[in-house]
């Protein structure tokens, strides 16, 4: 298939993982891959103005190009600040 690339789009929740394979034109962007996957219609909690995205665990912009075989990942927002959680655990273990 000249001019076409295959890309996976992933979105994971604690209880379920979504992994969609899409075929796009060469030069397609991260945003185009996400829209083609149908995940925005399937999961209304995904907001591309708020959710961060990446390609194989590396941060990416919606305007970045995707390549054949890439896995585009949509990240959920953090529920708690990791630094704060570490501080609380350290305090708790110090009080034992």
Curated annotation (Swiss-Prot):
Gene3D superfamilies (alphabetical)? RnfH-like (3.10.20.280)
User: What phenotype is described for loss of this gene?
Assistant: Deletion of the ratA-ratB operon has no effect on bacterial persistence on rich medium for this strain, but does affect bacterial persistence for E.coli strain CFT073.
Q: Which GO terms describe its cellular component?
A: plasma membrane
Transmembrane regions? none
The protein's superkingdom reads Bacteria
The family classification in the record reads: Belongs to the UPF0125 (RnfH) family.
Q: What does this protein do?
A: Does not function as an antitoxin to the upstream RatA toxin.
Annotated PANTHER family: UPF0125 PROTEIN RATB
Q: What is the official name of this protein in its record?
A: UPF0125 protein RatB
Tell me the lineage of the source organism: Bacteria, Pseudomonadati, Pseudomonadota, Gammaproteobacteria, Enterobacterales
């Amino acid at each position: 298939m000249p001019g076409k690339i295959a890309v996976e789009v992933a979105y994971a929740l604690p209880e379920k993982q979504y992994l969609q394979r899409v075929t796009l034109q060469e030069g397609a962007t991260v945003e185009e891959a996400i829209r083609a996957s149908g995940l925005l219609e399937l999961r209304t909690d995904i907001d591309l103005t708020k959710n961060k995205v990446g390609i194989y665990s590396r941060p990416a912009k919606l305007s970045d190009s995707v390549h054949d075989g890439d896995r585009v990942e949509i990240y959920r927002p953090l529920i708690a600040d990791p630094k704060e959680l570490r501080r609380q655990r350290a305090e708790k273990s110090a009080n034992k």
